[in-house]
Amino acid sequence: MSNYKNFINYFKRSDETATLGLGMLVSGLILFWLGWSIYWIFFYIGVPLIPIGFALYIYGTTGRADENELKKIIQENTDAITFEDVKNSAEFRKRIPNSPTEESFGEYVFNTNVLMKKTKSGSVISSEYVCAKMLILNDAFLVRTYAFSFVANKTQKSEIEIPFASVEKIEMEHVNKRYMLNNKELATKASALVITHDGVKTRLPRKDDIYADEFVLKLNRLIKINE
């Protein structure tokens, strides 16, 4: 990914700029027509609105990415995390179930070092993202993560194997935080699957949907079966 500037513009420019520009452009054209055909004063009101509105619209829509591009990159990076090397490895052959299960995770990263934006849908996103996948073995969880930035050449890969025997607890964690953006307070909610093992906690970002609790129960049952 090399178009960092477009993503910087996406996070820094307001979505309302293009909307305002389009509104001014349309209003200017209508007033221009009214001034030409009905009353001259509308002409002089509409004429300056046209170039200003056009400039704002161009500024708000060009040279910047959009939400669909973010989603595309997220999907590409998530798909790039695979376990084909593990599945084809003689070392892991006996530890992989006949029908291995893979689970995907991912969420935007929120801290004071990222750019944040409130989307048109009302959700809050940031300029950094972490995606992960978990391969459930017969005796352990194998987790691979990939964290990256939309606005800079910043990436980080990691891998951890968590033996079932070392797991103390699996649960969902919810954290509410507030940040300031353009003098406005933004509320964010981060959810994660937390696996406590060997006295440490491994957090995998996961949306708190209707399947979250069911997934936690599934993993806990798996741990008990293999005790």
Locations of regions flagged by a protein language model:
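Hydrophobic alpha-helical transmembrane segments
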Residues: 18-22, 32-51
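Anionic N-terminal interaction surfaces
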Residues: 2-17, 51-134
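Conserved beta-hairpin
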Residues: 124-156
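Alpha-helical transmembrane segments
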Residues: 24-26
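Short, flexible helical or helix-coil boundary motifs
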Residues: 14-18, 223-226
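Hydrophobic, Leu/Ile/Phe/Ala-enriched alpha-helical segments that form helix-helix packing faces
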Residues: 77-78, 87-96, 138, 171-174, ...
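Short regulatory "switch" loops immediately downstream of catalytic or recognition motifs
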Residues: 114-117, 143-150, 173-179
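Acidic, Ser/Thr- and proline-rich intrinsically disordered linker/docking segments
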Residues: 154-227
